[in-house]
Amino acid sequence: MKESPVDIQHIDFYFDPMCPWAYQTSLWIREVRRLNDLEISWKFFSLEEINLVDGKKHPWERDLSYGWTPMRIGAWLRRSSMSMCDDWYGAIGRALHVDGRRPYERDVAIELLGQIHAPPTAWDDALADPTTHDEVRADHDRAVGQYAGFGVPILVFPSNRAMFGPVVVPAPMGDEALKLWELAKAYNSFPGLFEIKTPKTGHDRDYIAAAFTPYLVARQWKSVQNSTP
């Protein structure tokens, strides 16, 4: 049964804080929420795990992982409040993708936790609790196993159909945000529609690189992207 494009009031949003594309999409979906009373459930997806290189440790086997560690903090915060997880993703996303900072570093993370009025022990408590690994891994495994996820952002609609994207920069605001939301809902209403994609020209790639400069300066990892299905 097709879902009406007009009656979507809740989505699951899968993200990895490392991903600049997911951050832009999160800004857009927050704007949709502001204008449309949309409810967002934040879920975790690990680019470090999905793109794991043979011979490397899984992110849950490392003392610190660039995306996994902040998501463990998010999982701990989400237990008490989805809005606190929301604020955490907003803070760490802004730090990395706008300010060019490294929110996976303890001092930066503790500063950001203070900004969102999280418990002062959140970093230490979350990382001392091995079940935060389990929660991040459960979200990731669900995205891969149930929705064939290969990257982020992923939107999951009430119909339980997943969509990769929209991949957009900059995040549209105001009426433009609502126009894109209508497109996303319409896309979801066609069960046989699997992909719409704009090829990136050299000019497009230069534009994207300029938009992502803070992230490119701050990151300490090499991007790895496996082929998509």
Where are each of the predicted segments found?
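Local sequence-structure signature of Cys/Sec-based thiol-disulfide redox active-site neighborhoods
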Residues: 4-29
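Short beta->alpha junction loops/turns
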Residues: 18, 81, 129-132
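C-terminal cap of thioredoxin/glutaredoxin-like
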Residues: 28-32, 106-229
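A structural signal for the main folded, soluble domain(s) of proteins
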Residues: 14-15, 61, 99, 224
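Short, low-complexity, intrinsically disordered N-terminal peptides in bacterial proteins
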Residues: 1-7, 224-229
